[in-house]
């Protein structure tokens, strides 16, 4: 069974977000998603300064099995990207909720966070797959 930290919020498309002290949110893909994809070989990230819209694809995770679009769980401006993934995409596999984060967003509408799933709700999504 996948690890689903309770302090995070989740999108049904397998992204997670974590609120940071500056009000931004860190975005990554769940352990379940990286298990399905397999070994990461390349990650394409948005650019700092890009505006992302909740539900729109904004990054790509490419593994030995497939390339998968990564969707923005919330709308806002990209304020940071995880440049370590450029040389070490395997961080997504080894530490999906830590060093394998994708990007940070300063939200334009924080109420979108309320529409995301808690750990229990995300587990239910996995169980239905």
UniProtKB/Swiss-Prot annotation:
The keyword Cytoplasm does not apply. PROSITE patterns: BIOTINYL_LIPOYL, LIPOYL. GO terms for biological process: glycine decarboxylation via glycine cleavage system. It holds the Pfam family GCV_H. Residues 24-106 form the Lipoyl-binding domain. Keywords: Lipoyl. PANTHER family: GLYCINE CLEAVAGE SYSTEM H PROTEIN (PTHR11715), GLYCINE CLEAVAGE SYSTEM H PROTEIN-RELATED (PTHR11715:SF3). The glycine cleavage system is composed of four proteins: P, T, L and H. This is Glycine cleavage system H protein. It comes from Shewanella oneidensis (strain ATCC 700550 / JCM 31522 / CIP 106686 / LMG 19005 / NCIMB 14063 / MR-1).
